[in-house]
UniProtKB/Swiss-Prot annotation:
One record GO biological process: translation
Subunit structure, interactors included: Part of the 50S ribosomal subunit; part of the 5S rRNA/L5/L18/L25 subcomplex. Contacts the 5S and 23S rRNAs.
Name of this protein: Large ribosomal subunit protein uL18
Family: Belongs to the universal ribosomal protein uL18 family.
GO terms for cellular component: cytosolic large ribosomal subunit
Gene: rplR
Function: This is one of the proteins that bind and probably mediate the attachment of the 5S RNA into the large ribosomal subunit, where it forms part of the central protuberance.
Length: 119
């Protein structure tokens, strides 16, 4: 019998492999993405100190009523970029969390770039 691999386990293995190569610092924090079925979350993380510097998600009150999940992701990208620039973090390391750079992840990344983040 052929067994189909679990997509989330495959993503977690891919994410662990990438996380071994990238790390965030206080000068250049890591922009981490987590995508669930309903929401998307973004965090700026300083891995050296082990602290979250800024965060945004579709659960925030600042997110206006989007027409779809891709538009909501773009709003989250803009919000995390504004919060990061306000805290003085302009250059970040992008961590897509093992997800493909497509759809909601790409929309968040492009909106973050348009609003002042460099990666």
């Amino acid at each position: 019998m052929i067994s189909k691999p679990d997509k989330n386990k495959t993503r977690q293995r891919r994410h662990a492999r990438v996380r071994g190569k990238i790390s965030g610092t206080s000068e250049r924090p890591r922009l981490n993405i987590f995508r669930s079925n309903k929401n998307i979350y973004a965090q700026l993380i300083d891995d050296v100190a082990g602290v979250t510097l800024a965060s945004a998600s579709t659960l925030d009150k600042d997110i206006k009523d989007p027409e779809n999940k891709t538009a909501a992701s773009a709003q989250v990208g803009a919000l995390i970029a504004k919060r990061a620039v306000a805290d003085g973090h302009k250059v970040v390391v992008f961590d897509r969390g093992g997800y493909l750079y497509h759809g909601r992840v790409a929309a968040l990344a492009e909106a973050a770039r348009e609003n002042g983040l460099e990666f």
